[in-house]
Amino acid sequence: MGLAVRKSNVPALADEPIKIGSGGGFWGDRPLAPLDLLKSDDLDYLMIDYLAELTLSIMTKQKRRDPSSGWATDLELWLAAGGIHTLRKKSVKLVTNAGGANPESCARMVLEQANKIGWHECKVAVISGDDILPRLDYLLENGEEFAHFESGEKISENGAEMMSANAYLGAGPIASALEIGADIIITGRVADASLLVGCMLHSAGWAHNAFQLGLTRESPVADWAPENVRNPLDILAQWTVAGHLIECGAQVSGGNYSNWGDVPNLATLTLPIAEIYSDGVVKITRGQGGGGMVNRGIVAEQLIYEIGDPAAYITPDVVVDMRNITLEDESEDVVVVTGAIGKPEPESLKVSAAIEGGWFAASSLLVSGPDALGRATACDAALRGRLSALEELEIYTEFIGGGVSLPENIRQRVSSTLNPPEVLLRWAVSSTNKQDITDFSREVAPLVLTGPAGVGGYGARPKPRRQLQFWPSLISRKSIEPFVRVELLTHLRITQESERFHFIRKRTRNILSRLQDELDDREWTRPIVKKLGWESNDADAEVTNLQEKEVES
């Protein structure tokens, strides 16, 4: 697929950094925080990562129940609260994977919000192609195995139904959307750091250069670099590290920090900003006017978060070697990041999938007073004894307050000294048999009267719920990239003076005339006919249809 660019609209990088803010770290993060960051700081882009590993499987279930759902509804909350107006006023580009399992519906919501404030020229790009579930049988027939990362088991050997399957796309489609003038970009599953890398491919002129060279979106993005860029892989690595550092939102501006007592005013924690310079240098800072902090220790903790091998942090765009990264406190709330080394992009892309896993439920009781841990253990033994005939039922027990969060070797050493005043006894159960879960739910509350003394805190019987099991695997790039689509959605405004308006009016009247006799026989249809007829002296009419334009392939 070509990049389909007609002219360059690349911001000048020069000595001024590109400022990219993070609006949050997951679906469920503070919903209005992105608006606060937009108002307090001058950004070029706002990126928001809404998708955790299993979020898409949840969204897929929602979409099956309601074809218009399956996306991160928190996006609508802050857009409607003034976010769409602020994006327009400050000319900030929004790039987010809020589209989840249904990026088209999410994009239409965004367009509706823009239309409400009169932003009719707003261009919303939809990036799709990550959802491979509709093509699963074809992919299996053509050699894709979807072997589980940990067990190595092939999906065909498991036999369970795959409920969702999404490949992690890279930065190329995002850069393409920005090149054709998108104001807001809605994606499905895109690698977290690629949200930022796509912005930089556009702002640094790489995407425009790729168009000039006739490169396709499937070509390695390192090849998009202009001739004067001497170390494109290392630049990509720096951009990727920047995206990795801010994709978890406030986790790099003071949240979830080991030395939490040093962080001022957690109640008003501000979100992080990455400032990126033309030579690849990255500075991490934070929004103005609130609590939080950015220092070397905080950035270091986020740097090693979820990376696996620091010598090979794999993304669709580049493989990053982090071992030579240097972090320096430049000033208060500013950390300079340098030294990332890039290696060529991987041949495969990660797939986040979920398979049908039977049924599950969870419930808990509170045990308080002397020897709370001993009595909680007795409760657990009683429940297991009463359910021992259910051979397929798996029971997992946690004694919260009794050291359950400690590593096993430490818990064994301190278990004899633990004497918590209360313990939250929590069970999670699973089974392929729904009735097993129902039987479990009926045995929890009776322990208040039929177990040790001092047991309470029970609630309603938990209902059996369908269980999804995470299935991470790989897929070849050639099975994904040719199917990625970038579409541009805009509002179509029509007045009486336009030829399009006259065509629509004429076509509608012709249809109505053929149905006139039937419609007149039904009294309830007359107001509708009158409404659709359009009197010739009407004022300018506005039709807010959606016009879709697919990027040239």
Feature-to-residue mapping (PLM):
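Catalytic or ion-translocation cores adjacent to nucleophile or general acid/base/metal-coordination motifs
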Residues: 115-132, 197-264
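C-terminal non-catalytic interaction/assembly regions of soluble proteins
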Residues: 338-539, 543
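Active-site cavity-forming subdomains of large catalytic enzyme subunits
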Residues: 114-117, 122-187, 193
